[in-house]
Amino acid sequence: PEILRSVLEPLLTIIVMIPLAYCVLGPIGSFLGTYLSTFVLWLYNTLGFIGVAAFAAVMPFVIMTGMHGAFVPYLMQMLTVDPLYEPIFFPALIISNIDQGIAALAVALKTKDANLKSTGFSTAVTAVVAGVTEPAMYAINLKYKTPMYGAMIGSAIGGCVAGLLKTAIYAFAGASSVIALPLFVSADKPNNLLFMVISVLVGAVATFAATWVLYKPEAANK
């Protein structure tokens, strides 16, 4: 009967999925997380600042595919077990998120379209302050393409600086934006926060300049 189905179907789903999650999906996630951690550390140790720059440049596409969630086991291991700091993913993510907002800001300042200007300012604040980049990406940067190119160029440059200065985060960032910058404070590396701020500023300036040059309002309106 339909009434029994509506009651039993969710119950049976839970009964089946809980053991499956603990016995199959959990170990698989742990296994993949371990190998992902190994790969990220290899990338950093082998390529150094180039690895951080590459991560920062492609981070928008990692976010769009939802793959950033796959890095949680790696981040938890780095920040809670060993070595208690993380030098590549979070620096790249924060720089990338801020630069998505800066690209949208450049469009807002350059365009004469009132609606686009309003959207640019609001999505820029959302990305820079809250670390939520989807509005900026989908409403502006991906839509007009050149702002995304500008953000990727700026993020690569900012990531390069962060890698060269060996910046690292010391706690898990809830919002990957300017709000997370205090998490770069370190007693062992007194200049770590300053170096991250420099990296963010360099990336932001490069993003703004690249977007300003590449984005053509006339071409975008065609």
Across the structure, where does each feature detected by a protein language model lie?
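Transmembrane alpha-helix interface/packing and boundary motifs in multi-pass membrane proteins
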Residues: 56-69, 79-88, 127-130, 162-163
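Core mid-bundle transmembrane helix pairs that form the ion/substrate translocation pathway
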Residues: 1-63
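Pore- and pathway-forming membrane helices of multi-pass small-molecule/ion transporters and channels
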Residues: 67, 71-75, 96-103, 125-130, ...
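Membrane-interfacial segments
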Residues: 1, 24, 28, 32, ...
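Transmembrane alpha-helical segments and their short flanking loops
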Residues: 49, 77, 135-222
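Alpha-helical transmembrane segments in multi-pass membrane proteins
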Residues: 9, 13, 17, 21, ...
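Helix-loop-helix junctions within the multi-pass membrane cores of secondary transporters/permeases
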Residues: 76-155
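Short aromatic-rich membrane-water interface segments that cap or initiate transmembrane helices
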Residues: 39-50, 84-87, 184-191
